[in-house]
Amino acid sequence: MNLERSERIEIPVLPLRDVVVYPHMVIPLFVGREKSISCLETAMETNKQVLLVAQKQADTDEPTVDDLFEVGTVATILQLLKLPDGTVKVLVEGQQRAKINHFKESDFFLAEAEFIVTPELDEREQEVIVRSAINQFEGFIKLNKKIPPEVLTSLNGIDEAARLADTIAAHMPLKLVDKQQVLEIIDVTERLEFLMGQMESEIDLLQVEKRIRGRVKKQMEKSQREYYLNEQMKAIQKELGEMEDAPDEFETLQKKIDESKMPQEAREKTEQELQKLKMMSPMSAEATVVRSYIDWMVSVPWTKRSKVKKNLAKAEEILNEDHYGLERVKERILEYLAVQNRINKLKGPILCLVGPPGVGKTSLGRSIASATGRKYVRMALGGVRDEAEIRGHRRTYIGSLPGKLIQKMSKVGVKNPLFLLDEIDKMSSDMRGDPASALLEVLDPEQNNSFNDHYLEVDYDLSDVMFVATSNSMNIPGPLLDRMEVIRLSGYTEDEKLNIAKRHLVEKQVQRNGLKPNEIVIEDSAIIGIIRYYTREAGVRGLEREISKICRKAVKNILLDKDIKSVTVTMDNLKEYLGVQRFDYGKADESNRIGQVTGLAWTEVGGDLLTIETQSMPGKGKLTQTGSLGDVMQESIQAAMTVVRSRADKLGINSDFYEKKDIHVHVPEGATPKDGPSAGTAMCTALVSALTGNPVKAEVAMTGEITLRGEVLPIGGLKEKLLAAHRGGIKTVLIPKDNERDLEEIPENVIADLQVIPVQWIDEVLKVALERDPTGVEFEAKK
């Protein structure tokens, strides 16, 4: 083919990935795409000329015209070889730059292209710029170390500036866009200046890299020198006899292994690691890992136990001193100790104390440890979301450690402590695993004698540990909950809070705030006032904070006024210390009202009175429900409405009231969400009262779920609800008959002040709650 510079040619185009071919450059290419193979075959049949053009994106499998650069290199095919896998290996030599004017229709890329004319340089100018480029490239080669020196020799034989620029570009580690830019720059001076700028940047980077390598090498030499000197020092000390009395590190570790009395499996594993340590360089990173592993193995208590107390009377005394109430928990601990007296080897119980915040779950764990004579260790599980927190990290990880369980056992030093798993319901899981699943083995008495920590890699016996878990709710995974003996701690009664404050909290805060016992007196009435009007909680944390506030103000008053020798806090002057009352517990209404019923509610901080209001008015049968009611409570209203409709005739209500009356049911404190089925009887009573004009007795409160047949079903939280009724001045409480068995857990002073009436049918409720007997009430099941 005649390569006249002004000539336009029609030529096959071969797209290339990540490669830019320059003139005078010989390069092998591997071609696999069908269109590209067709392109080469056509070129071989004609004049063996092909235009090599780079793709803009290398990952494009089927490039279009827009995916190719406009400027490429016309090359001659020197050799073409078809490979067995269907691909083609071709050897090409770049000839001259060319620019694509437009593409023509074909099975492959066929374009009309035009040769690019490179302007010639002045001989003097060419000599100067060639010399500068070669000198800079020589400096680049010395730092790069990857380009063979022969390349520099070949460059010295090139006088033509354009060819020199292309040769340098072919050996430079440039990005594809930069290589393409070199191809597209027509002016040779500009092309070489661009390359020299690229070389300058690369030289700067290589110099920084060289400095870093030098520092690393120097540091390594320093470490090797220190190791050599340490070994020399040991040899000198040995010759002088200075180390004869000093114990050998390996002998010390072996002695610790012997003294730990670990099981055979653990001993073999530890001694195997000790032998590995002896063969390692003391300064190596692996030696540190092995030494750390051995230290953990000998620090874990394998056989050492604390002596468990078996004196039941003393244990009961300790539990009663530390905590007021909580009889069921104390009873369970004493049962365990009683059995321990008869059986020497008894697996520790796994208890789960479930109750609201502040009722003494965590402090009770410490008291149980004191009563049983066990050492106490606590592990907070709130926010734990990584399985490795329980099972540990495998030793392949850098900085790996045993799980918190083994760490705590190592710290406590005995294998039979009381282990408190605090806030077990606050665990969660993520991509790193589920810690709750890891605890399944720990809390299973049949499996925890062979607990396997990922770090230790041997079984560890946890069967002697007495596990006590605490939780605010029953929101614990089922399999985990099934392994524990759940003991529920309900909120303290007002009487229990009063006794706790008198026995523990007041004395504690008096000492903590620097008061003497004779300088402050807090009367019982003041404590009850704090409980009722300044705190709303199931526990006593808020109560303790308020008592602390009183003590602080008492200290301030005594120091500011020398005439004040002591302070007495009563209900009358409580406001001076704590400010205005923050809460107002529900109280019984003073008069009987139509359509208004007092229900009983359970909350996380105890029980409360729940007022339910109902109004009926002429309308079209619309039922309105307000007061932030949940789905279950709204369904209770629907069920109550059905019960009233089914008994309308017997109750003296027009049977078509649901078509001619609009009814509005409202539960005050609308900003507070309310839900649950236990207000069913109260809803039904309020509807009957509003529709018949029969007032509801103000001294009566009720709780119970209602069915469509009018049966009253059992509810939960009876203790808290009766305490709220007692505190609110209620005289009579109607409860489901099936809840009668729960009355045994109610304090005697509460039962004595309340008339508790178990009921099974809504008819019984209406007869007691309404001021006048409903018309035609019959005590019979509605079949």
UniProtKB/Swiss-Prot annotation:
Belongs to the peptidase S16 family. The gene is lon. Keywords: ATP-binding, Cytoplasm, Hydrolase, Nucleotide-binding, Protease, Serine protease, Stress response. GO terms for molecular function: ATP binding; ATP hydrolysis activity; ATP-dependent peptidase activity; sequence-specific DNA binding; serine-type endopeptidase activity. SUPFAM superfamilies: P-loop containing nucleoside triphosphate hydrolases (SSF52540), PUA domain-like (SSF88697), Ribosomal protein S5 domain 2-like (SSF54211). It is found in: Cytoplasm. The lineage of its organism: Bacteria, Pseudomonadati, Pseudomonadota, Gammaproteobacteria, Vibrionales. ATP-dependent serine protease that mediates the selective degradation of mutant and abnormal proteins as well as certain short-lived regulatory proteins. Required for cellular homeostasis and for survival from DNA damage and developmental changes induced by stress. Degrades polypeptides processively to yield small peptide fragments that are 5 to 10 amino acids long. Binds to DNA in a double-stranded, site-specific manner. Regulates swarmer cell differentiation of V.parahaemolyticus. Homohexamer. Organized in a ring with a central cavity. ATP binds at G355, P356, P357, G358, V359, G360, K361, T362. InterPro entries: AAA+_ATPase, ATPase_AAA_core, Lon_bac, Lon_bac/euk-typ, Lon_lid, Lon_proteolytic, Lon_Prtase, Lon_prtase_N. Its EC number is 3.4.21.53. This is Lon protease. The active site is at S678, K721.
